[in-house]
Every structure is written in structure tokens, then in C-alpha cells.
Amino acid sequence: MKKTIPVVGMACSACSAHVEKRLSEMEGVHSASVSLTGRSATVEYDETIVSLSQMKQAVNDIGFDLVIESNRSIAEIERRNYTLLLRKTLLSWCFSILVMMLSMGWGTWLFGDVLQSSNSSVLQSYNSSVLQLSLLLALANILFCGRDFYVNAFKQLRHGVASMDVLVAMSTMVAFLFSTFNTFWGDAVWTPRGIEWHTYFDASCMIITFVLTGRLLEEKAKNATAGSIRELMGLQSKTARLVNEELRMKNEESAAASPSSENEESAAASPSSENDSSFFILHSSFQEVPLTTITIGDVLEVRAGERVPVDGVVVEATSFMTVDSAYVDEAMISGEPTPVRKSKGDKVLSGTVLQQGTLHVRARQVGEQSALANIIRMVQEAQSSKAPVQRIVDKIAMVFVPVVLCLSLLTLVAWIIIGSTFNVLPHAILSAIAVLVIACPCAMGLATPTALMVSIGKAAKNNILVKDATALERLKDIQAMVIDKTGTLTIPNQQIDFTRADSLPLEEREQLKPHAREAITTLISMGVDVYMMSGDRDDAARYWAEQAGIRHYHSMVKPQDKENLVRQLQQEGKVVAMVGDGINDTQALALADVSIAMGRGTDVAMDVAQVTLMSDDLRRLPESIRLSRRTVSMIRQNLFWAFIYNLVSIPLAAGIPYAFGIHWQITPMWASALMACSSVSVVLNSLRLKFISL
């Protein structure tokens, strides 16, 4: 069984890497892929060996949570968590501002005249009270606002793993404990040795405040990256209008039993002189019920302006224009703006909108089996999938935190050994804390998945369904594209008499799809060699190749020939994409580096394909390649700046400038602010993909 499960509590790539490792190591789990930006885990497992509750317990042990309860709304959980995070952030700012005011001597400024006229014991008592009040405020900040950092860090260290929570917990706790020691024993321990001591409650508070602020902004930005999924989910109906089938059948029987030769008077009294479908619609009773209660075979009523709640078959249809049909907007599936006429026996899909008329629809696929649910699942799985570069980053993130801990310890020891002033210990501790805080695996971890999530969502809005991140990344390298002719490049003419089709001109038998030539021209200008495969005779194949602007074509081909061409091009060192729509294309689709299916093709072709074009507009082909190139470029930008940030900031926090005579370094407080900004900037940079023109 394969299932996508929401994960709560992940903050950095180390978090997602540890959750993935934990799930992958469980007996019965075949594969697990955890998405930080998607906040979900896609798990393939044997339900006879391992259960969801066992997975939940394993993940809970390291400080995270799997949401497996069907009665828990993911959107509601995310809303509640965001509200809680917002409250913690605001409260932490209050604590931090108060501590900063005390540490900056605002009390001395307010009561300066009184303190100056007081004796030394009063002044000492005042200073001691200020420090103790700062201690209490910092402790309250830790307990109420930073509690999750410490709880998660304890759980993770107990199981031998470490994430951003460990860095934050250790840095703030060291600053707090060192300051607490100085508050009560500073004069007794340091003053006799000639060491000037300080407290750093302000640093302890501000680290938590800045990290919480960064996460709040990050959550806001990540929610924006998931906008496409929310839009798709918004197409799902929550309720449906269930028709009383027993009454409807009685109406049908009554209408069928009425003799066609009834007098005019009785005909006038009836809703229609004929067995008008509107008769059944107007006289069928119904009730509004939750969509989850609908089962296959139920008949539902859909009115103008409403979304079709399930996949089904039209039982009855009527509109003010016609007595036996209605018009449905299928733009969310096909991308075509023109409403489609639906009559009795026609299929309708969930999420589509009835533009005019009334429909009675018999449910065929409901809930998770509907076309819309499948599209949502495909997009979620694609956004949760990982590009090859992300797997490398995850491996780095797994060791990043332990390496930072070692660097922090090395900084502490180095300053103690080479320091030449009496204040070397406080300075060494502050430098070590700054290294812990400023190192940010989050920026590296978010670099790839945020860009992928935005681009896959943008692709879905443009009727391009990408099944996995690897395909999206590989599209940029396409050098050759093999396109099947019939159904992909051309549309058969449904109006002709096929018994005499051979005697008709080629352009009457079928027609080139709109914008096909424009799409081919664009592909060629992008450096892609296009090959057309056709089962037609050579003259027909040449004709359609010329119409489409394709230089390379093959005629009278069999399914094996398509596969052979793909293999031949690959042997020449080219990255090959195959575009098809039928069962006879599946061998070539499976072999190609990137497989692309038309959304109106066979289910087999779409199952094999990595990318599905939901509309017949072939301009989506160059658009998908262009999107891939922009996405990979964005990922490289994000990774470059994330690595540069860590390479530059860690030495500055450790105090390297002192070695060159520059008496300046990044303090723990500013380190936390820079760390928060680095993560947010990566997410905001990825969001630029939403606004690019394809």
C-alpha cells in the first residue's frame, strides 16, 4: 500500500531526513520519502507487517507527529499550529523587549537620581534585583515560548539524532545557565580573579524570539508555495444533493405508462406533453448530505453554477436551451474554456462546473477514486518526491548539526587556548553560542523542495501534471522528442464516413491540432530535435510532418519501431522524451528518459508516463521544458546562497576577524536574526517562480 501522510513539527531538512530514516528502517516499510515543504511523508508499506499507528509511535519518539486520524482536518491542524506559533512569537517578543530594556539600563535611566543619592548597598541590591528579574523573564520565555525546542531536542538526542532544535536548545541553555551562574556567583568567582563578568539573558531570549519569528515567516511563505494544492482541494465539494431514487423511478414509470394519445386537456395539465426529462428533475425529492456518505450507484442532482461532486454518468439532463442536455465547464481538467454539452449517458468528472441547466448524475467513482482526487494525489506525491540533488542535500543535513556542534566546541577551546585577555572565557562562550545559532541547515534544506513545490504547483495550474521531481529536473536536458502522430499531433475527423476514408484528401481524414506547428517551432528553437512516428504510408506521414514543421519523420511504424528509435537516440548520447497517447506507445514511454502522455489518451499510457498534459494544447510541451530550466536555475541559486551563507557566517560568528586585527564578530543575538533571514529569503526567492511567464 502507498499512502501520503501529513507530518507535524518539522522545521529543517535535518528533521525531514530523520523522519524519513526512521520510517525507512521500520520492518514492512518498502520506501519512504518525506517532504519538508509539503509537510508529508509518502510511504509504501506492507499493511500486514506494519500499521500506521506503529509508524506514528516511531515518529513521535523522535519529536514529530504523523496525522493518521481521518477525523483530524489537516488544514485545521496547520491553522491551529500557526496560531499557536504566532502567540508564542508575540509573547517571546514581549519577554525579550523587557529583558533588553533591563540589560540596557533603562531602570537606571528612569531612577538615576534616586540611585545616585543612595549608598552602595542600595545600588548593589538594585543591580541584583534587575539581574534576578531578567533571569525570571528569560526562564518564562524558555518555558512558555521555547519549550518545544527543548522537548524535541531531548527526544532526538535520546535516539542519537540531531536537528535545528538541538542547536537552538543548546545555545540558549548555555547562555541562560552561564548567566544564571554569574547572577548568583559572579562576584564571588570572577571578581577576585580580575575577570569582568556579564549576563546574557538578552541573548538567550532574543535567540528564541528570532528563531520563532523566522519560523513564523517561513510558515507563511511555505503556505504560499502550497497554494496550488489548496486551490485544487477547493474544487472538491463538501456536500451533495442526493436524489430520492425510489420517487424518481415512480415518476419515470408513471410517465412511461401515460398514453401518447392523451387529450389536450390532460397534456396541458402535465409538465410536458412528452416524456420531458425536466419532469423527473422537478418532481424528484432530494436531501443535502455530506459527500463522504455518497456511494457508487447513488443519483445526485447538480444545478447551474454548482460543481459536480463525483465522477459519474448523466442519467437526465435539461437546460433552458435544450430539453435533453446541459453544459459543463471542464477547464480544470482540459484547460479548454468552452463549455461541453452533456446528455444522457455522457461522463462527467468531479470538480467540473455545471454552467447551465440541471443534471442527474449516477455516481461511478467517489471520494479517493475520483479524477479530481487522483489529480490532487499526483500533485501531492510529485511535490513530496525528491530530485537527485535533494537527496545529496539531505545526506549533508544529517551530519550538518553534529559538525556544527564540533565547530562550536572547537571555537570555545580555541578561544580559551589562544585568548590573551582576562575576559577570554565569556568571549569564548559567546563565540561558541554564536556558531551554534548562526549555522543553518534550514536554508540548505529548503533550497530544493520549495522551488520544486512552487513549480509543480504552477505546472498543475497550467494543465501539466508532473508525477515526480526527477522528471521535472530531467526535462531541462531534453535533446530529442519523439511524438506519435495520431491522437497526439493530429485529431481524426469524427464526421467522415470511414468506409470511404481512403478516397478522401488527407486534410479531410484528420486535422492538425491547434497550435501544433507553433509548439514544434518553439521546441526546435529551444534546441530540441523533433521526430514524428506514424503508422501511415510515407506520403501521408510526410504531408503531416510538413504541416507541423517537423524535419524528421518515420512512416508505417509498429510499436516496436517507436521503442527502437528511442533506444537508438539514447545510444547516440541524447536525452529523449517520448510523447504518446495510446497503448501502442507504452513501450517507448517506459524506455524514454522522460515520458509524456496526453490527458485524453488511454489510462495505460498515463500510468506509464511521468508527465501528463491535461489539455490538447501542444504548447504545453515547450512550456514544461522552460519551467524545468527555470526551476533548476532557481534551485542552483538557492543552494549557492545557502552554502555561501554558512561558509561566510560561521567563521564570522567564531571570531575569525580577530586573527586579522579586526575586533568585531557576530553576536549570538544577531546570529539568530541572520539565521532566520536566510531561511525566509530562500522561500521567498522560490516564490518568484509563481510569477514567471512560460
Each language-model region and where it sits:
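Conserved catalytic phosphorylation-site environment of P-type ATPases
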Residues: L430, C440-A501, P505, A588, ...
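Membrane-embedded alpha-helical bundles of multi-pass transporters
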Residues: W109-L115, N119, L177, K458, ...
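Soluble-to-membrane junctions at the N-terminal ends of transmembrane alpha-helices
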Residues: A75-C94, N152-A175, I376-S408, A432, ...
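Conserved cytosolic catalytic loops of P-type ATPases
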Residues: E27-Y45, I49, S53, H198-F201, ...
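Transmembrane helix-loop-helix hairpins at the membrane interface
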Residues: L84-T239, K395, I666-P668, L694
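Small-residue-enriched core segments of transmembrane alpha-helices in multipass membrane transport
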Residues: S96, V399, H427-A443, I666-S681
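Conserved ATP-binding TGD loop and adjacent catalytic N/P-domain core of P-type ATPases
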Residues: A17, V466, K476, L489, ...
